[in-house]
Amino acid sequence: VPYNTTAEEVLSLQHDGLFIYDGPGDPNDVPSVVKLIQDLQGQMPILGVELGHQLVCLANGAKVVKMDCGHHGCNHPIRNLDTGKIEFAPQSHNYMLDADSVEGTGLRITHVNVLDGTPEAAESTIYPTLSAQFDLSGDHPLYEKFLKLMEEGKRNA
């Protein structure tokens, strides 16, 4: 759907979830998408990836700031804080979640960049909402988690 779609329009489509992907520029420049996420959280599972991650973070009250040196290229090491495992993923972003702004938002940081410690993924402790700053491979566990959230949503509808 276009960036200026309303929550009512999205809900009328009767989809099982909302996937918000990448795009150019500063996430602070698209408040309409931030509002859309705020309006839909709790009504359907949401997965934000790359720019979508930044928008999910803003929608939950965290800050997203411009990085001094962005992450670009392949094979960036990322630590999964739940498992302790190191994953590798391509990245291309100049903005990041401000880790100091997460407290009190209901977000929990789940992955960090091994090289500089910046947050790379988060999930809501309140809503069925997930997000990742890095490009997810086709079999990444976050997709499976998102699918499970959508299945649970259908059972509880």
Each language-model region and where it sits:
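Short hydrophobic/Thr-rich beta-strand motif most characteristic of the beta2 strand and flanking loop
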Residues: 1-3
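Short amphipathic alpha-helix with an adjacent loop that forms part of the alpha/beta core around
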Residues: 7-14, 103
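Structural motif
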Residues: 19-21, 123, 133
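Catalytic His-Asp charge-relay segment
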Residues: 128-132
